[in-house]
UniProtKB/Swiss-Prot annotation:
Family under the similarity heading: Belongs to the COX17 family.
Motif (Cx9C motif 2): 54-64
Record has Disulfide bond as a keyword: yes
Transmembrane segments: none
Organism this protein belongs to: Arabidopsis thaliana (Mouse-ear cress)
Molecular-function GO term, any one: copper chaperone activity
Role of this protein: Copper chaperone for cytochrome c oxidase (COX). Binds 2 copper ions and delivers them to the Cu(A) site of COX.
Subcellular location as annotated: Mitochondrion intermembrane space
The protein's name in its UniProt record: Cytochrome c oxidase copper chaperone 2
Boundaries of every CHCH domain copy: 32-72
Disulfide bonds: C35-C64, C45-C54
Residues where Cu cation binds: C32, C33
Keyword annotations of the record: Chaperone, Copper, Disulfide bond, Metal-binding, Mitochondrion
């Protein structure tokens, strides 16, 4: 029976490591829900002043998304 216990513990150790790798590479939020503050500022600026005048807010939102794990 000791052989079965060792085998079971080895199998249970493999599963969490796979889950940890998956959660590290996958963003926790959907991109539409990440960084609501910078998204709001960016959108309001674009509506009022046009995209070319809002590069500061666009870049701030992109940096925020990248910090959340999104590749944009």
């Amino acid at each position: 029976m000791s052989g079965l216990q060792a085998q079971d513990s080895a199998c249970s150790l493999d599963k969490p490591s796979k889950d940890v790798v998956a959660t590290e590479t996958k963003p926790k939020k959907r991109i539409c829900c990440a960084c609501p503050d910078t998204k709001k500022l960016r959108d309001e600026c674009i509506v009022e002043h046009g995209e070319s005048a809002c590069t500061k807010w666009i870049e701030a939102h992109i940096l925020c998304l990248r910090s959340e794990g999104f590749k944009v």
